[in-house]
Amino acid sequence: MSEFDAQRVAERIDIVLDILVAGDYHSAIHNLEILKAELLRQVAESTPDIPKAPWEI
């Protein structure tokens, strides 16, 4: 994902829900982890470096 697109995220969540309905929990969790990582990476790229608090190191 190069930029945040709410429609695309919603579509991917729908896919995960379909996978859950089919009963493939492992794949659904894996897909959610991938989506989370992509979103966090995108946020990290778009925000300036903020010093971490000592408990976040």
Curated annotation (Swiss-Prot):
Belongs to the UPF0509 family. InterPro entries: UPF0509 (IPR020887). NCBIfam families: PRK13658.1 (NF010179). It holds the Pfam family YciZ. This is UPF0509 protein YciZ. Induction: Expressed approximately equally in exponential and stationary phases (at protein level).
